[in-house]
Regions:
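Active-site loop/oxyanion-hole signature of alpha/beta-hydrolase fold enzymes
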Residues: 11-14, 31-80
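Flexible "cap/lid" loop of the alpha/beta hydrolase fold
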Residues: 94, 100-143
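Gly/Ala-rich beta-loop-alpha elbow adjacent to hydrolase catalytic centers
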Residues: 81, 85, 89
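Active-site signature of alpha/beta-hydrolase-fold catalytic machinery across serine-
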Residues: 15, 91-95
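Serine-hydrolase catalytic-loop signature spanning alpha/beta hydrolases and amidase-signature enzymes
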Residues: 5-15, 26
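The conserved beta1-alpha1 loop
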Residues: 3-5, 82
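Conserved alpha/beta-hydrolase catalytic His-Asp/Glu region
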Residues: 139-200
Length: 200
């Protein structure tokens, strides 16, 4: 089971899935908030809980992958995760226990912004942290940040940092990552993710 990273989708595995499928059944899925999946309103921990909102967090994404493995795959599974998908793969493997054959991490997210790692931050970042957290909770600000990031030129710049060789950073990949940013709810998924400060 292939688990994508932040801002990505199942199609991000377009080359890997084809190769892996030639030797074993291979699945890639869109995590809630990404790709073609639903993008419900974000539920930040201090906000009133409603059934329409979603708490974008590693536990919930891991539960999604766990349920997928149990209901669709129905056999022992190898989990492969990229970036935040790596964190989700690790959490899912704990839930699956013996049904997890193993985990492969590709450029696993370090979660350096997590509150548990605050002591590792510079003095300036520790001082600014409460201010940053207050600002990114505001929908107006998070929507504006999202609107800046949800552009093909910005996506291309990020891809070139992530893939310095530039191999496979093509129009198809850029469009694959750009298209979901135009769907209803995408700014809410972004808001939910950028507010993950205590979740691993």
């Amino acid at each position: 089971v292939l688990i994508h990273g932040f801002g990505a989708c199942k199609e991000h595995w377009r080359f890997n899935q084809k190769t892996i499928s030639s030797i074993a059944p291979c699945y890639a899925l869109d995590l809630i908030g990404f790709g073609d999946s639903s993008k419900p309103n974000s539920q930040i921990s201090y906000e009133k809980k409603t059934y329409q909102n979603f708490n974008y967090c590693f536990d919930n994404w891991s539960q999604l992958v766990y349920d997928f493995c149990n209901e669709i795959v129905k056999k022992p599974v190898l989990l492969i995760g990229n970036s935040i998908g790596g964190v989700i793969a690790l959490n899912t493997s704990k839930k699956l226990s013996q049904k997890a054959l193993g985990v492969i991490l590709i450029d696993c997210a370090q979660r350096t912004m997590d509150d548990k790692r605050l002591a590792e931050q510079s003095l300036l970042m520790r001082f600014l942290r409460p201010v940053i957290k207050t600002f990114v909770r505001q929908r107006l600000l998070s929507s504006n940040i999202f609107n800046i990031a949800a552009k093909p030129k910005f996506i291309t710049k990020i891809l070139k940092v992530a893939y310095p060789s530039g191999n496979n950073v093509d129009e198809e990949l850029i469009d694959t990552l750009f298209k979901p940013t135009q769907s209803k709810g995408a700014p809410e998924a972004f808001r939910g993710f950028i507010n993950l400060f205590d979740d691993y």
